């Protein structure tokens, strides 16, 4: 189904539900340690590692530095945990911090890892990757004719970024396409405008969020004001929030975007850690989405945004922060969710800087919607399913090797066992 057709369905949904009473960062968190974590080091395992180290130093046919060996050991230790945990060297850590600021030199795509290869979660709008035809679910088999097998995501990012204007070649593997796809791209400064908007027709607004960044919450406020102005100052009768192919981003951005549409202090998301231990509870309040001590970006938000009938669009490329928003608005019956089942990345990554300037990113908890649903490996099921017939392949969290299963039970949803809703349309 084309984008224009899906928007028409969303507009119809807005009209159908307008009579219903509408109720109602990457961010580092301090890792808590339980007493049982304070165990002694496994001496025999340390001895085994030292023995392997000694054999490499004595017998490997090339000389390897101690730094390279120990970096490799740390990468292997962390990467085997799950697809999103990762050891980052100094450069990888710096690149990761840069990517959330909204401007960087590269190709413009969100990537992950599966079976030792780099996989595209979603290309970013209006970037070299999107213009070259890179699609969600593509595997990047080679970068400049060098295999990506075994690369971490931060290592792949490092290889794909570079001086603007320089050339790079990616070899892609795409499901149901027999031959490798070779694309030639030119690196560019990626200025990600995370919020776009326009009037679909008089009285009906459209807001697109492509990624959750530092200015996304303020961008929602600016978009709402601009839509009202474009509507000649008249109140809007409905709004569409498009989160399709939004790979996520900053947690506080997700909380702030949710807060723009929810009553004050409404629960947005919570976390649970090891053994179901309760973690954070984040609500629609400034202290839970303001990154610094600055002004509330929603302070002068048009009041109608809290009650206006709305539809949220999602698909299998909607991940992480976008799933938090869709889940919160769905649970509070604030919006009708339309599209296909989302990606299912419901895990919290804690970024822990290390003393040498590197960092380790660890999965430390899972996200839960206001109604205590876990997003992990199952995603958000739309209220109204509308399949995108132009989308040949759906890729989800449950397709990733080593993914964490949903703690509440039920079948993890991958590309081969999507859950259909009662309203599904073929």
Where are these regions (language model features)?
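Flexible, low-complexity junctional segments that flank or bridge functional domains
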Residues: 2-239, 245-247, 260-263, 421-425
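C-terminal "post-core" interaction segments
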Residues: 23, 195-426
């Amino acid at each position: 189904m084309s984008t224009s057709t899906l928007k028409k369905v969303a507009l119809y949904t807005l009209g159908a539900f307008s009579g219903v009473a509408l109720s109602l960062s990457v961010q580092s968190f301090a890792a808590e340690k339980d007493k049982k974590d304070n165990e002694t080091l496994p001496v025999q395992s340390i001895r085994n590692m030292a023995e392997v180290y000694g054999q490499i130093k004595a017998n490997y046919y090339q000389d390897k530095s101690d730094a390279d060996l120990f970096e490799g050991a740390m990468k292997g230790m962390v990467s085997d945990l799950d697809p999103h945990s990762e050891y980052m060297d100094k450069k990888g850590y710096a690149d990761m911090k840069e990517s959330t600021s909204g401007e960087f030199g590269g190709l413009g795509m969100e990537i992950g890892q599966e079976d030792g290869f780099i996989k595209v979660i979603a290309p970013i709008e209006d970037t070299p990757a999107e213009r070259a035809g890179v699609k969600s679910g593509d595997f990047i088999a080679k970068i400049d004719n060098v295999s990506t097998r075994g690369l971490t995501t931060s290592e792949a990012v490092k290889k794909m970024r570079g001086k603007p204007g320089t050339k790079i070649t990616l070899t892609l593997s795409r499901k149901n396409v027999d031959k490798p796809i070779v694309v030639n791209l030119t690196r560019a400064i990626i200025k990600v405008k995370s919020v776009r908007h326009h009037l679909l027709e008089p009285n009906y607004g459209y807001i697109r969020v492509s990624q959750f960044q530092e200015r996304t919450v303020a961008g929602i406020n600016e978009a709402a004001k601009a839509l009202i102005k474009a509507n000649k100052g008249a109140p809007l009768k409905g709004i569409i929030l498009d989160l399709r192919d939004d790979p996520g981003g900053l947690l506080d951005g997700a909380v702030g975007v949710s807060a723009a549409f929810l009553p004050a202090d409404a629960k947005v998301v919570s976390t649970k850690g090891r053994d179901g231990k309760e973690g954070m509870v984040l609500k629609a309040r400034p202290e839970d989405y303001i990154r610094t001590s600055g002004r509330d970006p929603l302070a002068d938000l048009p009041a109608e945004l809290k009650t206006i009938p709305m539809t949220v669009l999602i698909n299998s490329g909607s991940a992480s922060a976008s799933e938090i928003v869709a889940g919160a608005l769905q649970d509070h019956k604030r919006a009708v969710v339309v599209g296909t089942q989302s990606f299912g990345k419901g895990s919290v990554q804690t970024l822990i800087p290390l003393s040498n300037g590197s960092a380790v990113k660890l999965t430390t908890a899972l996200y839960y919607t206001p109604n205590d649903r876990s997003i992990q490996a199952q995603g958000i099921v739309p209220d109204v399913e509308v399949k995108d017939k132009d989308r040949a392949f759906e890729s989800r969290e449950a397709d990733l090797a080593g993914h964490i299963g949903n703690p509440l039970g039920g079948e993890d949803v991958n590309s081969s066992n999507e859950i259909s809703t009662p309203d599904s349309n073929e």
